[in-house]
């Protein structure tokens, strides 16, 4: 991967990545390993995203011209009982980062968001232009992530409308990358299913929630590529092609693991589909998490990012085979 299309105004100032220890954060570290640009990765111990003073201290210390925010309060069910913390991390923290980029460093801001900003107002794939919410039908997590998106857009729109010469000359830009069903290096649905498949002879998996499984490695690559591009600011749906249910994903992952030599107890016919109502949880989950990726495809094609856009199945297959291979070696 190349960062050659991104013209850093001052290469002594590092790219700042928040969320070092998450699945996307770990993938970003791997992506940046071979790129000769200074990068600083921050975790919870380095910056408290619920504390504005802590964020500002880090921003003033490093003075970044590029921020990639892969951090979030993602404990969806816990957020129902901790709304203030969820909003601090998911709304106020990215607002502070966006203000710094738009008004002080005049650089690039990449922010990862979620399918949880939608509340089943469509039965087909959502476009970036579709109305989000309604807010009263979203989980606390969804509300806080949507509020973060809106805060970022407001900050950049106000900076642009101000007509400040440095903003216009230096092309401050933001990219909000909405995604869904992320998996990578860390705890996730696929790893849970593979573990349970080795322990049980029957599984019950929700079949009436539909979305797009997305590789954290691919998400990291897309985020870096967008930061290094000259494409238009805005929201982009960053998901592969295709769609499936949680049940469909479980079946595909387990069958792939079995073919790769992983010992599994459960047979495909014993992975039973159930409705989400049979598995009640504190926070609301969208039944429809489909998101159209056509806008992102067009942007990436203009950058010659890839000759072929990925399908979720090929990404999951590669992930499972790599995971099984690593497990067999250990």
Question: Language-model features: where?
Answer:
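N-terminal Rossmann NAD(P)H-binding glycine-rich loop of SDR-like oxidoreductase domains
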Residues: 6-31
């Amino acid at each position: 991967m190349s960062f050659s299309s991104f013209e850093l105004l001052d290469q002594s100032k590092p790219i700042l990545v928040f969320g070092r220890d998450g699945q996307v954060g770990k993938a970003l570290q791997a992506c940046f390993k071979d790129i000769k640009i200074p990068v600083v990765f921050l975790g919870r111990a380095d910056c408290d995203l619920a504390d504005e003073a802590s964020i500002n201290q880090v921003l003033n210390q490093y003075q970044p011209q590029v921020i990639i925010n892969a951090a979030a309060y993602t404990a969806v069910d816990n957020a129902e009982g901790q709304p203030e913390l969820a909003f601090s991390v998911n709304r106020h923290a990215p607002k502070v980062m966006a203000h710094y980029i738009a008004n002080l460093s005049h650089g690039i801001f990449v922010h990862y968001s979620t399918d949880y900003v939608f509340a089943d107002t469509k039965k087909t794939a959502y476009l970036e232009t579709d109305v989000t919410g309604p807010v009263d039908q979203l989980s606390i997590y969804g509300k806080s992530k949507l509020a973060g998106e809106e805060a970022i857009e407001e900050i950049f729109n106000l900076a642009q409308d101000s007509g400040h010469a440095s903003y216009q000359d230096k092309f401050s830009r933001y990219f909000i990358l909405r995604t869904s069903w992320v998996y990578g290096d860390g705890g996730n649905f696929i790893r849970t299913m593979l573990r349970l498949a080795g322990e049980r002879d029957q599984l019950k998996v929700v079949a009436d929630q539909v979305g797009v499984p997305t590789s954290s490695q691919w998400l990291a690559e897309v985020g870096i590529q967008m930061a290094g591009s000259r494409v238009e600011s805005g929201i982009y749906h960053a998901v592969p092609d295709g769609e499936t249910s949680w049940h469909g994903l479980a079946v595909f992952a387990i069958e792939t693991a079995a073919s790769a030599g992983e010992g599994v107890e459960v047979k495909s016919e014993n992975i039973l589909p159930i409705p989400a109502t049979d598995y009640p949880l504190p926070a609301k989950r969208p039944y429809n998490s489909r998101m159209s990726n056509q806008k992102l495809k067009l942007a990436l094609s203009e950058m010659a990012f890839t000759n072929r856009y990925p399908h979720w199945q090929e990404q999951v297959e590669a992930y499972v085979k790599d995971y099984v291979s690593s497990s067999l070696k250990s």
